[in-house]
Structures are given as structure tokens and as C-alpha cells.
Swiss-Prot record:
One GO BP: isoleucine biosynthetic process
Pfam assignment, any one: PALP
Catalytic activity field: D-serine = pyruvate + NH4(+)
GO molecular function: D-serine ammonia-lyase activity; hydro-lyase activity; pyridoxal phosphate binding
Top enzyme category: lyase
Protein name: Probable D-serine dehydratase
Cofactor(s) recorded in Swiss-Prot or TrEMBL: pyridoxal 5'-phosphate
Amino acid sequence: MIHGKTLEAWQQSHPIIADLVALKETSWFNPGIAQASEALRDVGLTAADVQAASARLQRFAPYLATVFPETAPAGGIIESHIAPLPLLRQRLIEEGALRNAGSLWLKADSDLPVSGSIKARGGIHEVLKHAEDLALAAGLITPTDDYTRLASEQARAFFGQYKIAVGSTGNLGLSIGIMSAKLGFQVSVHMSSDARQWKKDKLRANGVTVVEHASDYSVAVEQGRQQAAADPSCYFVDDENSPQLFLGYAVAAERLALQFDQAGIQVDADHPLFVYLPCGVGGGPGGVAFGLKLVFGDAVHCIFAEPTHSPCMLLGVYTGLHDETSVQDFGIDNITAADGLAVGRPSGFVGKAMQRLIDGYYTVTDEALYRLMVIAHEQDKVKLEPSALAGVPGMLRVLQADEYLARQGFTPTQLQQATHLVWGTGGSMVPEDEFNAYLAKGRSV
């Protein structure tokens, strides 16, 4: 029995579950979405909260430029570029016999400095918020000071009295670990069984304590939570339920709007924007989507992408069970090459806050991710890790979803003028030998 019903009963009441359980690639576009002006109220956070996070990152920019020289050219702002994907677009058009395809772009969070993934946004913001709170309370700085003062030995010794803990499949651990250690915190990253060895090695090389677990992501998070609960000096970064992570991700939207302006990309009712976001527990894509909805309103359509073996957010929202269920409850194993997306139980906070703002969800097989990795690398010279490719089939899924397109009332002209944005969540820091092994696998599937 699953929450009082047999699997057969679930499949009758929620037909898509049959395909999810069979590990088939599946798409679901939520008929229950609402206008942004109404649905944004569900979130419990506001544009002012996002502005506060943005201002905080601005205050810390001189510090970041000092301690991470690779951020100095951008003045200490951790941001990624956008790039067109013309060859990949052509491939998708041919594969799906697509008509009315707009343009296809990449948001290259894979190239973000410091930790090389989307998690540099939320993870670094939350650590900086905690550091700022401590430093202000202790009188180390005032809000108008030059925050490069926090790079001093005195500041590092002060932060060294405190601990930070987090549970991660890899990329969040990298961002939290590297940033916390740089400030001087004692930091522990609880890693799930699917975390890549190179990510653990990189953390240890940065002075981070890595605690390895034989179980999946949810257990790693719980262990981190327990460590912090037993130690008053330890701050726990809760990937399943963190407004500060969420807000750090949301800041991306205002910066993307500027990049679109510079590239001459229009976003409005006649020029819709579709954004494809790989989804694990949901904090990263949820936060980015929240920011996008604040900036672009009903002109942006956010779609979450998950592995066929870990469709936790799709399952949670589709059934209405959210974090009360896991993919394992339905006999799905949560074992995937997309390590950053290997999450069995979704964030209840994100699922409930964002369910009326996310247009749809789809799943993609590991084999497809490997194959797309090769195509993206060879055609458009893009280096992405497996989980970061999950957004690539999005344009195909949307343009083949006739019922969804009709429900939204899109005209052929609107679709021709649309922008499709793949959020490339990580990959630049994958070691060359590991990346070559991925490519070899992609060529063999």
C-alpha cells in the first residue's frame, strides 16, 4: 500500500504513474497553474527578499574578488554567460520534426566561478548571509564597511569558532564547502552514495571535512541536520527547506534580464520564454523559477527536468503528496548517472510554493543524457555533466505537447518568436579524464 492506496489504484487515478514506474520518458504539463500575480503569493517570499539577497551579494563582491581572483574581472559578482545553441537546435528540430521552433540558448551556470555549478548561487549566498549575521552581531563590520575586511586573519579566526554542515549529492556541497572554508568556518559536507569521487577530493583539498554515507541524498541531509542539532555552534544549510538558498538562486533572473537586453532578446506575451531547469530536490530550479516569474511574469514558462529513475518533484506535485512521498514508495530506485538529480523525496517547501508557477515536468533517461552530452560537446562545444543535460530535450517536449500548447493558446507566430533557454547546471570542473569517460559512454549508447 502507498499512502492508503494500491499501486494499481494510483495508476488508475493518476495514469502517468504507470509510465513513471516503468521508467519511461514522461511529460506532464500541470493544468492547475495560475497567473503569476496570483500564484506568486503562494511562495511566502517577495521581490523585496530577492533584492535583499542581491544587495548582499553586491556588498560581498569586493571580498569575493579578493579571495577568489577568478571573480575579479566581474568585480566579484559570480555570474555566467548565455550562448546560442544553433547546432543542437537544428538537431532537435530534425529529431522531432518540429515546426515553429524559436531560438535555443544555454545559460552556462556550468561555468560559474568558485564551484562550477548553479549551486554557487544559492550555496554561496546562504554562507555569506550567515557570515554577515555573525560578523555584524560581533561588531566586526557594519553594513556600510568594505567587506574585504572579512579576508583578514582576525575575521578568519572569528569564523573558525563556528561550524557549518550540509548534506549533498555533490554540487551544493562544493559551493558550501569551498565558501565556508575560505571564510574560516569549520565545515562538514555529508555526501550521499552517488556523489562523484572528484567532488569529494576537491572538497578535502579545500580543507573541508567530507562525511561519506552509503545511503542516498535524504539520509545525507538528515545526518547533517542531526550533527547541527547536537551542536549550538553549528549552522545547518537545509537543502530541503531553505529560503536563503532559494533567494540566492532567484537573483539570477534580474541578471538574465540584463543579458537578454544586451543580446536583443525580447520577452513578452508575443515573445514567450521557455526555461528548462534540471531538478533534484528542487531548491535551485525553484528559486530560479521564482525569480524569473517575478521579472517576466506570465511571459516565462518554467519546466522542470528529472531523470527517469528520480522523478521526485513530478511525482510529488502530480500526486499532491509532495515530500510525504518518495520515488522509492512507488518502486523507483533513485539510481541515476545524473548524480546532482539523484533525489528520491522532493522539497515540500518548493513543491507547495511553486506548484502553480511551474508549467510542466518531464523525465529523461541516463542514456539520453549521455547521448546529448556528446552532441552538445561536438556540435556546440559545450562541456556539461550528465545532470546538466536534462534541460536540453525541453524544447522538443514542449513543442510536441499539443494539448498544453492549445491550453495556453500559443499561436504559430508566438512559438516562432519564442526563446528556449536550457539551464546548464554544472560541468566545467569535471576532470578531463572523467569527462572523456562520459563522452565514450555517450558514443556507445
